[in-house]
Structure formats: structure tokens, C-alpha cells
Amino acid sequence: VCLAAQLAASEGNADTTRFSEPTEYLHKACTKALSVLEKDAPKGFFLMVESAIIDGYGHNNDSEGMIEEMKEFDQTLKALIAYVDKHPNTLLVVTADHETGGTGVAYKSHEVNQPEGLHLNFSTKGHTGTVVPVFAYGAGAEKFRGIFQNRELPGIIEGLMRQ
């Protein structure tokens, strides 16, 4: 069973309207998908979750939006890690297909004796060739060590699912 949840519009057209209150859309979507798949796929399942909203913020060079989206992602990731901890035959893989915006971190001020804050800088409104990390947790995570092309991910995952 494969359930793909795309939670935003297509690339470059993502709705980057800020919510007035914190949302848990990604967390809620993942929780619901897991409950449906657990019930309907007793032999196991593959769940791909994408939140393209951060990509839209990157294209817009919107650092505040990116930070808020990362907070939502962090909450979702905590829930997914807890799920893996309760289901030892589960693998969680986190990656990206590209970086957007050429995001860099810099100090807000270079003045001596001033409180320092961080500021995100951007080098483009497009995608970059920056290497994106792959994080894996759970059963089979050791297969994701080292450097490899992202096009190799499906084969690694498929091999693990066949075991």
C-alpha cells in the first residue's frame, strides 16, 4: 500500500499565506495516515509525506515563514520518532530533493558589545545544488550511511521492504 500525501500546491505555487495561529496540519495528516495504513495494510506499508510549503518560503526568501514551517516539521518529526519507537520494524527516512534559496546563517550585527541575533541570508530565489542530508532512524537505518545520490533512495527502501 502506498499513500502519498502532498500537502501543498505544486512547486513554485505553494500557498505561503501565514496562519494567524500555529497549526498542526502536517502532524495531523501523518497521524491520520498512520492510523489508516495500520488498519488497512497488515503486511506493512510505505508512507511518503511531503510538505512543500517550506519550498515556497525559500522561493520567496521568507525567513520567518521558513522558521515557522521548521517548527511544525520538528513537532511532526517528534511524533514520527515516537511511532518508530513503538513499532520496531519501522524505518523513518527524512530528506529533501533540493535546497531552495541558498540559505545562509549570519549575525544580525557586527558591532562589539551588542546582543547578537541570527539572520537568514539568501543567495537566490531558485533551487541550489547544495548537498541535502539523509537522516534515517529505526529498522535498516544503517543502510543510509555515507554519501549517495537521492535517486538511490527508492532502491534501498524497496530492498528493505522485501526483507
Residue ranges and their predicted role:
Residues 1-163:
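A post-motif C-terminal structural segment
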